[in-house]
Regions:
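Helix-to-beta-strand junctions that scaffold the AdoMet/dcAdoMet cofactor pocket
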Residues: 119-120, 133
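Conserved N-terminal segment of class I S-adenosyl-L-methionine
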Residues: 1-106, 113, 123-128, 162-171, ...
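Short, glycine-/aromatic-enriched active-site segment of Class I SAM-dependent methyltransferases
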Residues: 139-164
Length: 240
């Protein structure tokens, strides 16, 4: 397992101190959106792996949609096994380790939800991931917007509190995946600005403007005011 300065943020417990709930409140919301994306394309994977599964809530919530599938969550944070204990009877397996270094066959579907922005080298990660999945679902927070760049404080906040090292727009997120050998099947906004749980009163108020701006100006509206996230269904490009 890599022990670089970025990885140590998670293995040392620093991340857990700043984010003790591991964003568990968002898990059912994310699972619903993963299922909706897979369902529209008729995908029913028999094996599902989540890299960076955190407290495990996404996989546990997703299992009701695919009761016969094999579910495995991987994470490198040493404090997480105690949180996984409550899901012992859930039918989801959890592994403390790196999926890309683990033995075994490739998974039908790999979930990479809110992970790439934390990695020191997302290019290397994606290059290795291509041989370990048939399909992948990615979730990107779209931190970059005209407002966030002008204010800068929101970008510094997510860097310090939750460890975002890379910042994305829709176009930048898709470019990264394509440059690393993934074919984009569908990319959709999640409506996070006005549907995600655990939003503050200020965030709910701002969502009114964001929703209107997005409705009027599409992608440009998202780049102006921000507040959105992007979910992407992709698969590795087959080499000849």
């Amino acid at each position: 397992m890599n022990s670089d300065i970025v990885t140590r943020r998670y293995t040392s417990g620093d991340y857990a101190k700043s984010n003790p709930d591991w964003d568990a409140g968002d898990s059912p919301w994310k699972a619903e959106r993963v299922h909706a994306l897979l369902d529209v394309h008729g995908l029913r994977p028999a094996s599902i792996v989540e890299i960076g599964c955190g407290a495990g809530g996404v996989l546990v919530s997703l299992r009701k949609y695919y009761p016969s599938a094999d579910f495995t969550g991987f994470d490198i944070a040493e404090g997480l096994p105690s949180r996984w204990e409550k899901f012992r009877e859930s039918g989801v397996n959890f592994v403390l380790g790196d999926y890309l270094e683990s033995p075994g066959p490739a998974s039908d579907l790999v979930l990479v939800l809110d992970v790439l922005e934390h990695l020191g080298n997302p290019f290397d990660f994606l290059d290795h991931l291509r041989s370990r999945c048939d399909y992948a679902v990615f979730h990107f927070p779209l931190d970059l917007s005209c407002v966030s760049v002008l204010r800068e404080k929101p970008l510094l906040h997510v860097r310090r509190k939750v460890g975002h090292l890379h910042f994305f727009t829709r176009g930048l997120a898709l470019a990264l995946l394509q440059e690393c050998g993934f074919e984009i099947i569908e990319a959709r906004y999640t409506g996070a600005a006005y549907t995600a749980p655990n939003r503050s009163l200020l965030a709910r108020f701002a969502s009114l403007f964001r929703r209107g701006c997005h409705a009027l100006f599409g992608d440009t509206g998202v780049r102006l005011l921000g507040g959105e996230t992007l979910m992407v269904l992709a698969r590795p490009v087959k080499t000849q």
